[in-house]
UniProtKB/Swiss-Prot annotation:
Uppermost EC category: translocase
Protein encoded by which gene: nuoE
Family per similarity comment: Belongs to the complex I 24 kDa subunit family.
Catalyses which reaction(s): a quinone + NADH + 5 H(+)(in) = a quinol + NAD(+) + 4 H(+)(out)
Matches recorded under Pfam families: 2Fe-2S_thioredx (PF01257)
A GO molecular-function descriptor: quinone binding
Species per Swiss-Prot/TrEMBL record: Pseudomonas aeruginosa (strain ATCC 15692 / DSM 22644 / CIP 104116 / JCM 14847 / LMG 12228 / 1C / PRS 101 / PAO1)
Subunit description: Composed of 13 different subunits. Subunits NuoCD, E, F, and G constitute the peripheral sector of the complex.
InterPro entries documented for this protein: NuoE-like, NuoE_dom, NuoE_N, Thioredoxin-like_sf
Protein name as catalogued: NADH-quinone oxidoreductase subunit E
């Protein structure tokens, strides 16, 4: 097999669903760059994360440089650039949550799951990520699991909280 054939067969390809959804979304914006975040969300929804190869493929559909898509993908913390677990735990590490007991809650989550921040459990069930602020300062320390916000989290309640996401 020639090198050019190898490159062609290994090239990332958007699914027809992804491509048509991105093209549809693109028509809602005057500037195709504005559709890049939606395009990234489309790929992530289909695949669970955004592989490196998706960046130039999205750029090609939108007619913009891959570097523009990359800039958006790296800016937004909700775009995952590596595989993540079925459930995403986002722990707030703002000053208010830190003072409210963030470290002990994170420590208990790490102990229960056997992972550190930025890691995924071996069974692919959970990914643990820090976030700057969840806007739930009146209930610090706070965390989110998927789309559910939990406030006033205490270390002794972590096991029960995690069990709800089996």
């Amino acid at each position: 097999m020639s090198q050019s054939n190898l490159i062609q067969t290994d090239r990332f390809v958007l699914s027809e669903t992804e491509r048509s959804s991105i093209e549809h979304e693109m028509h809602h914006y005057e500037d195709p760059r504005a559709a890049s975040i939606e395009a990234l969300k489309i790929v992530q929804k289909q695949r669970g994360w955004v592989p490196d190869g998706a960046i130039p493929a999205i750029g090609e559909v939108l007619g913009i440089p891959a570097s523009d898509v990359e800039g958006v993908a790296t800016f937004y913390s909700q775009i995952f650039r590596q595989p993540v677990g079925r459930h995403i735990i986002r722990v707030c590490d703002s000053m208010v949550c830190y003072i409210g007991g963030h470290e002990s809650v994170v420590g208990e989550i790490q102990k229960q799951l056997g992972i550190g921040l930025g890691q995924t459990t071996a069974d692919g069930r959970f990914t643990l990520l820090p976030v700057c602020c969840l806007g739930n300062c009146d209930k610090a320390p706070a965390l989110m699991i998927d789309d559910d916000t939990h406030g006033d989290v205490r270390p002794d309640g972590v096991a029960k909280l995690l069990e709800a996401y089996v």
